[in-house]
């Protein structure tokens, strides 16, 4: 095996056949020390007790798979021991070659450090990449004697020359793997080694994935949410641990003299070997010198990095410490083949040059030109070290990677090359995200260029404020340096949220300007928080800070909550806040009340087109246009115009939007609308694939449908046109039913069997994903004032906003959401943190309402009169999993209602506090139920508030001072922003445990990292690989792939939305409903039968259940899992609602 420690230097050369002979178990010599692998019984590393260096060997040289959660195998015979001083105590250490179980004989070798403190005989466990933690015994330290005695080597250098590496990440990396050094790939250099390698594992020639897969069995991986799980892994806690604290600073370091071309293996600068053959065997000399290159000094026994010496603080490079093409090429030649074995070796030179340059440049200012710093190279080295611990074959860092362009190309090569492997590794998913953030860093511009950019177009007032606080902003930027956060073990740093989060920033949210520059994440949140601070009123500052604070204090208040993803603005707000493009509203509800074709076309080309031009999502009520003649469809030509208009706007837009047409089920064209999408469209002139449809269902339809389902014969439904329907759409409840039945009694309309229309609805939903279903009477019944005679006639694009709209006024809503996963700490939900997040979100959205521009006068009136906001949630399912709960559990049912109540209570209290501080109530407050002291939840018989005292105090204050806003809680999908937060969307369960989408740019993968970590805690070795193979075959459904698990097993919690009973999901929405004064975008997830059919009764049953539970939204999307295992159908994927989906 290549790069094996020179064991033969002490034991004498043996033939390959001798090394392969099985040996009897041995015991430690009396008075000596022995080291054993805790995971394997009967395998022991033995030491002799001669004078001089201790000799160690494995009692069984065959490959031995360690137990659960261990991915390493032991392969060796005798290794040289060394004496070294560790934290003032004499210690014995040895270095034993180990090999990855899947890599086998491909020559991939790492080095494990074995050691203990001085004292009587004891045991010390072999460190592996699983735990890296040791039981420390007290072996007797042999004294060096005679002329061949080896003096103690100097303390090890930092692993690559960066001073910060003395402070390694405590959540993952060297400190968790202190027993294992980084590995490299090298070919065999002798026949015996070739034979040994070839016999070690028969899977040598496997692909990258299979060759690396066993590392996924490594124990507890880096947990980005370390506070989410209090369970410990299988690693052994040391009896005695001697670690250097962060505050101690780096230990004194004596770096070895670097090897220069022409140096002999025995050169004192390298540390001459002491065993036989060391002067003639270069590999033996190099390996014997590995003791001088252990990892960071804070560990008790640190890993050996490489046989190639690292370069010290006085490296003696043949060129100056200045980054130029000539110098970089010279260093590459100087390092020679070592760069192939150690891909990050060039980074050491880059780092030292950057450190020297930092001494010459002045402190960073707004005008400072962006440059790659020591911390940038440190971030790359951190990522490479983590990837090497996964035994990945890394390309060497190119000599020109000190330039932003080539560093970006190298990071891209790594991301594209290893992206497919994230499906099985949460750690790799996180590390590739770090590389994408580094790629973003290479395109960063100075603050001055960013502020002056015409493409960014910053608000003038914001620019002035930023200039006034230049020094503080530069300090904050340095404090949030990603590398500093990593090495100081700051949990949940933004750059570690995963690959999908980083890509979403890079591809969608960060502005591009100046040809090739990109807004940095820090600049984006500075833009948003700075603008919010500029527009915050005196009352808002008192609410947020408890006093009349400064701009800088308000900036920090918003910035930290945004940067930490406690609150998330809507997509238009994230893109436009802080710029002079003041359009931040998300949802628009338009009801032109047009009754003719010409009036409808004017509304579409006027109001609707203006909103689409600002990328707003539209809900368009078309009920009034209903003049079909026999055999014709009056509405379809107008809808074709709308479809083309949406397609034209989206073609040139970086943020596609959409429109949804609302009709009541008695509209004369309803059957034509149900056939306008996909394969149901009979002819191209009737096809409208770029828009959605929604049915505004009265209770009467479901009352009659239930009668049919109960067995009643000849239950009918009537369709009316404009001339016969009169003002039917203006009424709801009993008044609607009386008028509808009166029209039927008079013989008006077309009568059809009700089951025919129900089947057409279900067929369209299962085939195209729509129509969406909303319940007209529930919406109007729970609105803040009586709408009888002017009933609310539609909702927005995503069915979660409830607003009146008319020819004169359009409904407008501004959105934001709170990240519930950030409220979980040590498996406990922090309701204080939730209240704080909701308060900040309410203040943010009120600033948006005050500052936003509107595309039409109707929208301006709707925005100003009602000041409606929609505070949503994201990460509910993620929070549930982090707490160790299942959505089916009684504990979660209670938590679900508790969260909704706290959100509404905190939002209304904040809105009321604004009025207490001098803000005026919304215009229609006096006609609302709030004026009389009534709350939304009081109209629900199942509501049982737990904060009755707070509600009563709010009631009194609300009646006295009013409310700044008319509506508060709207549970939207949060499809886009949940990706940058790396949590589940909205309130829905995870769609799948491995999201995969193939586009022309490649495959996008987003694994459920919580599931991967639970799998690693449960299985080990081949069992883990088998479990993942089974999950792959079953679309990552744990219930289908692992049916033998005990019902109480932790893995049973990881169900997908398709695995849950849909009636349970409807019940969860109903439990929240009293505290959701808008509505909820509830998607239904159904699975085809084994024969590929989906009974219509399945969807009918679910819609009837949603109606009976009193919901406002009966179905947003209908997503169908195919029985053929070919994926999930969810309607037209080309239309993405990023406006209200955040």
Curated annotation (Swiss-Prot):
Q: Please name the top-level EC class of this enzyme.
A: oxidoreductase
Q: Provide the GO biological process annotations.
A: deoxyribonucleotide biosynthetic process; DNA replication; negative regulation of tumor necrosis factor-mediated signaling pathway; release from viral latency; symbiont-mediated suppression of host apoptosis
Which spans does this entry mark as compositional bias, Acidic residues?
192-205
User: Entry's PROSITE patterns?
Assistant: RIBORED_LARGE (PS00089)
| Catalysed conversion reaction | a 2'-deoxyribonucleoside 5'-diphosphate + [thioredoxin]-disulfide + H2O = a ribonucleoside 5'-diphosphate + [thioredoxin]-dithiol
User: Can you say where in the cell this protein is located?
Assistant: Host cell membrane; Host endosome membrane
Region annotation (alpha-crystallin domain) ranges: 294-400
According to UniProt, where does the site described as Important for hydrogen atom transfer lie? 587, 813
Please tell me the species this chain comes from. Answer: Human herpesvirus 2 (strain HG52) (HHV-2)
Q: What is the name of this protein?
A: Ribonucleoside-diphosphate reductase large subunit
Task: Tell me which stretches of the chain form a coiled coil.
Answer: none
Q: Which GO terms describe its molecular function?
A: ATP binding; ribonucleoside-diphosphate reductase activity, thioredoxin disulfide as acceptor
- Subunit structure comment from the entry: Heterotetramer composed of a homodimer of the large subunit (R1) and a homodimer of the small subunit (R2). Larger multisubunit protein complex are also active, composed of (R1)n(R2)n. May self-assemble (via RIP homotypic interaction motif/RHIM) into homomeric fibrillar amyloid structures. Interacts (via RHIM) with human RIPK1 (via RHIM). Interacts (via RHIM) with human RIPK3 (via RHIM). May interact (via RHIM) with human ZBP1 (via RHIM). Interacts (via C-terminus) with host CASP8.
Q: Does the keyword NADP apply?
A: no
What is this protein's function?
A: Ribonucleoside-diphosphate reductase holoenzyme that provides the precursors necessary for viral DNA synthesis. Allows virus growth in non-dividing cells, as well as reactivation from latency in infected hosts. Catalyzes the biosynthesis of deoxyribonucleotides from the corresponding ribonucleotides. The N-terminal region confers antiapoptotic activity in differentiated cells such as neurons and is important for viral reactivation to increase neural survivability. Prevents host necroptosis by targeting host RIPK1 and RIPK3, thereby hampering the formation of necroptotic RIPK1-RIPK3 complexes.
The listed location of motif RIP homotypic interaction motif (RHIM) is 55-75
Site annotated as Interacts with thioredoxin/glutaredoxin: where?
1137, 1140
Q: Where is the composition biased (Basic and acidic residues)?
A: 16-26, 164-179
Q: Which family does it belong to?
A: Belongs to the ribonucleoside diphosphate reductase large chain family.
Q: What is its EC number?
A: 1.17.4.1
Q: Where is the composition biased (Polar residues)?
A: 119-132
InterPro entries found in the cross-reference section: HSV_RIR1, NrdE_NrdA_C, RNR_lg_C, RNR_lsu_N, Rrm1
Question: Residue ranges under compositional bias (Low complexity)?
Answer: 277-303
């Amino acid at each position: 095996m290549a790069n094996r420690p020179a064991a033969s230097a002490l034991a004498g050369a043996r033939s390959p056949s001798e090394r392969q002979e099985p040996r009897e178990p041995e015991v430690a010599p009396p008075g000596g020390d022995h080291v054993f692998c805790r995971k394997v019984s009967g395998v022991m590393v033995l030491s002799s007790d001669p004078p001089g260096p201790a000799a160690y060997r494995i009692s069984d040289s065959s490959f031995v798979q360690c137990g659960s959660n261990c991915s390493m195998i032991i392969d060796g015979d005798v290794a040289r021991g060394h004496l070294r001083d560790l934290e003032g105590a004499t210690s014995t250490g040895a270095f034993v070659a180990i090999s990855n179980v899947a890599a086998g004989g491909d020559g991939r070798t790492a080095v494990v450090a074995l050691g203990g403190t001085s004292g009587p005989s004891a045991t010390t466990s072999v460190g592996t990449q699983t735990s890296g933690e040791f039981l420390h015994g007290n072996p007797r330290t042999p004294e060096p004697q005679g002329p061949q005695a080896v003096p103690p080597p100097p303390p090890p250098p930092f692993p690559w020359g960066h001073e910060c590496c003395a402070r390694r990440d405590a959540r993952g990396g060297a400190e968790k793997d202190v027993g294992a050094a980084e590995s490299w790939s090298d070919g065999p250099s002798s026949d015996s080694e070739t034979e040994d390698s070839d016999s070690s594992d028969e899977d040598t020639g496997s692909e990258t994935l299979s060759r690396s897969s066993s590392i996924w069995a490594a124990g507890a991986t880096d947990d980005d949410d370390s506070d989410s799980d209090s369970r410990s892994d299988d690693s052994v806690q040391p009896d005695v641990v001697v670690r250097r604290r962060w505050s101690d600073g780096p230990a004194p370091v004596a770096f070895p003299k670097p090897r220069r071309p022409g140096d002999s293996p025995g050169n004192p600068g390298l540390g001459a070997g002491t065993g036989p053959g060391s002067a003639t065997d270069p590999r033996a000399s190099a390996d014997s010198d590995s003791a001088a290159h252990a990892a960071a000094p804070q560990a008790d026994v640190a890993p050996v990095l490489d046989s190639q010496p690292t370069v010290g603080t006085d490296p003696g490079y043949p060129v100056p410490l200045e980054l130029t093409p000539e110098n970089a090429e010279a260093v590459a030649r100087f390092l020679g083949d070592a760069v192939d074995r150690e891909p990050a070796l060039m980074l050491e030179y880059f780092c030292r040059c950057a450190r020297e340059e930092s001494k010459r440049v002045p402190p960073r200012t707004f005008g400072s030109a962006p440059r790659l710093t020591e911390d940038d190279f440190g971030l790359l080295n951190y990522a490479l070290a983590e990837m090497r611990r996964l035994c990945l074959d890394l390309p060497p860092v190119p000599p020109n990677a000190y330039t932003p362009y080539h560093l970006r190309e190298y990071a891209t090569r790594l991301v594209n090359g290893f992206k497919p492997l994230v499906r099985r590794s949460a750690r790799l998913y996180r590390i590739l995200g770090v590389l994408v953030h580094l790629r973003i860093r290479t395109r960063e511009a100075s603050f001055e260029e960013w502020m002056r950019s015409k493409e960014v177009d910053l608000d003038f007032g914001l620019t002035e404020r930023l200039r006034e606080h230049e020094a503080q902003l530069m300090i904050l930027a340095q404090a949030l340096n990603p590398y500093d956060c990593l090495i100081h073990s700051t949990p949940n740093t933004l750059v570690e949220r995963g690959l999908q989060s980083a890509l979403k920033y890079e591809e969608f949210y960060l502005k591009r300007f100046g040809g090739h520059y990109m807004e940095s994440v820090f600049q984006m949140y500075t833009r948003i928080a700075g603008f919010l601070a500029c527009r915050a009123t005196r009352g808002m500052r008192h609410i947020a800070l408890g006093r009349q604070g400064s701009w800088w204090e308000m900036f920090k208040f918003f910035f930290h909550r945004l940067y930490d993803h406690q609150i998330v603005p809507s997509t238009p707000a994230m893109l436009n806040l802080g710029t002079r493009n003041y359009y931040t509203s998300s949802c628009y509800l338009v009801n032109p009340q047009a009754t003719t074709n010409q009036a409808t076309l004017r509304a579409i080309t006027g109001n609707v087109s203006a909103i689409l031009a600002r990328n707003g999502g539209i809900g368009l009520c078309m009920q009034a246009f209903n003049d079909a003649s026999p055999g014709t469809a009056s509405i379809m030509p107008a809808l074709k115009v709308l479809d083309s208009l949406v397609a034209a706007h989206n073609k040139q837009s970086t943020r596609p939007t959409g429109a949804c047409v609302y009709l009541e089920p008695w509209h004369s064209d309803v059957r034509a609308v149900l056939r306008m999408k996909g394969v149901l469209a009979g002819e191209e002139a009737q096809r409208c694939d770029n828009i959605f449809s929604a049915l505004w269902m009265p209770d009467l339809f479901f009352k009659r449908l239930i009668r049919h389902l109960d067995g009643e014969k000849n239950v009918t439904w009537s369709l009316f046109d404009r001339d016969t329907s009169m003002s039917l759409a203006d009424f709801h409840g009993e008044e609607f039913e009386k008028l509808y039945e009166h029209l039927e009694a008079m013989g008006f309309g077309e009568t059809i069997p009700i089951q025919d229309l129900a089947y057409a609805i279900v067929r369209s939903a299962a085939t195209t994903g729509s129509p969406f279903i909303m319940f007209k009477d529930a919406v109007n019944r729970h609105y803040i004032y009586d709408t009888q005679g002017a009933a609310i006639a539609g909702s927005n694009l995503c069915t979660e906003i409830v607003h009146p709209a008319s020819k004169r006024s359009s409904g407008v809503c501004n959105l934001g959401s709170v990240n519930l996963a950030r409220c979980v700490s040590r498996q406990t939900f922090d309701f204080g943190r939730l209240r704080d997040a909701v308060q900040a979100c309410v203040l943010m959205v009120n600033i948006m309402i005050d500052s936003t521009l509107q595309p039409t006068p109707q929208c301006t009136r709707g925005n100003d009169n009602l000041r409606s906001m929609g505070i949503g949630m994201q990460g509910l399912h993620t929070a549930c999993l982090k707490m160790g709960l299942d959505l089916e559990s009684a504990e979660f049912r209670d938590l679900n209602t508790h969260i909704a109540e706290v959100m509404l209570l905190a939002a209304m209290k904040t809105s009321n506090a604004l009025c207490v501080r001098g803000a005026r109530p919304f215009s229609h407050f006096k006609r609302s139920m709030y004026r009389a002291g009534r709350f939304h939840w009081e109209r629900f018989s199942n509501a049982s508030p737990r904060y009755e005292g707070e509600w009563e105090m709010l009631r009194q204050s609300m009646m006295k001072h009013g409310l700044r806003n008319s509506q508060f809680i709207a549970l939207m999908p949060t499809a886009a922003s949940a990706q940058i937060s790396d949590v589940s969307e909205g309130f829905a369960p995870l769609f799948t445990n491995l999201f995969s989408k193939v586009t022309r740019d490649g495959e996008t993968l987003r694994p459920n990292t919580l599931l991967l970590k639970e799998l690693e805690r449960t299985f080990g070795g081949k069992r883990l690989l088998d479990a993942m193979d089974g999950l792959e075959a079953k679309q990552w459904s744990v219930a289908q792939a692992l049916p033998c698990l005990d019902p109480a097993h932790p893995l049973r919690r990881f169900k997908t939305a398709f695995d849950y009973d849909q009636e349970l999901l409807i019940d969860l929405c109903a439990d929240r409903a009293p505290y959701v004064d808008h509505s909820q975008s509830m998607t239904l997830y159904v699975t085809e039968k084994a024969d590929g059919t989906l009974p219509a009764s399945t969807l009918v049953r679910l819609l009837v259940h949603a109606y009976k539970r009193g919901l406002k939204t009966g179905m947003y999307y209908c997503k169908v899992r195919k029985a053929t295992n070919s994926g999930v159908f969810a309607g037209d994927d080309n239309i993405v609602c990023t406006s209200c989906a955040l």
